[in-house]
Regions:
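Conserved beta-strand hairpin/beta-sheet module of binuclear metal-dependent hydrolase folds
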Residues: 1-50, 154-165
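Conserved beta-strand segments of alpha/beta enzyme cores
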Residues: 2, 11, 53, 80, ...
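A short catalytic or substrate-binding loop motif that flags glycine-/basic-rich loops and adjacent residues
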Residues: 13-16, 125-127, 146-149
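Short, basic/glycine-rich phosphate-binding loops at helix/coil junctions
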Residues: 22-26, 108, 168-173
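Active-site neighborhood of phospho(di)ester-bond hydrolases with catalytic His/Asp-centered motifs
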Residues: 32-35, 54-63, 81-85, 144-147, ...
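Active-site environment of divalent metal-dependent phosphoester hydrolases
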Residues: 37-39, 62-67, 88-91, 149-153, ...
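Active-site HxH/HxHxD metal-binding segment of metal-dependent hydrolases
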Residues: 38-41, 46-131
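Metallo-beta-lactamase
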Residues: 132, 139-202
Length: 202
């Protein structure tokens, strides 16, 4: 997992799935998502190699490929987990995760032990209408981008870098998935229209 600079203090950990972060200083960072649970060791090793302690996770949405290590970092490092209200409600308990992943029954938590590490009580919940959050002296803009999930958010870093997460898919992904997953196709399309008007440096 390679740490690559995007702009200013905004960096990305480059693996098969990108994990963005914002450096608050030489030793502290804010993670924008944590990837999948099977990236955990690689992610932690990359952070340790860079001398970075994740003081917060500003999580885009409650899918396992974006919040797979939220609970782990919260428990082992005291990392603050920050999520929007609609996403936080889905991952506070095994039942919430089961309701989100309706193809899982409660027995799946025994069959897939990784699911047992996923439930997480966020330290801070972004309420509807909250458009900014201050973390460690840095100001982040919150953009509501629902559709892929019920309360998906995108984040603008202080460097004017916009992290869209799954609000918009790359051409590489669309080549394989012609129409990506959306819990609400109407809201997803509305979000895409809205994003056409959003400007950012990166």
């Amino acid at each position: 997992m390679e740490l690559r600079q995007v702009k200013g203090n905004t960096w990305v950990l480059d693996s098969w799935e990108l994990i963005p972060l914002y450096k608050l200083d030489a030793h502290r960072c804010v993670l924008l998502d944590t990837g999948t649970w099977d990236q955990r060791d690689e992610l932690e090793a990359a952070l340790d190699a860079a001398g970075l302690d994740p003081v917060a996770i500003l999580c885009s949405h409650a899918h396992m490929d974006h919040m797979g290590s939220n609970a782990y970092f919260q428990k082992t490092r005291g990392t603050q987990v920050i999520m929007s209200l609609g996403e936080a409600a889905q991952i506070m308990s095994p039942l919430g995760i089961q309701l989100q992943y309706y193809n899982f029954n409660m027995g799946a938590f025994g069959q897939y032990p990784e699911l047992g590490t996923a439930p997480c009580l966020p330290d801070r919940i972004l309420l509807p209408g909250e458009r900014e959050i201050e973390i460690g002296g840095a100001q982040f803009e919150i953009l509501p981008t629902p559709g892929h999930t019920i309360d998906h958010i995108s984040v603008r870093t202080p460097d004017d870098v916009l992290y869209l997460a799954d609000a918009m898919m790359t051409g590489r992904i669309l080549h394989h998935a012609k129409f990506p997953y959306a819990i609400s196709v109407g809201e997803y399309l509305d979000t895409l229209v809205k994003l056409r008007e959003v400007k950012a440096a990166e």
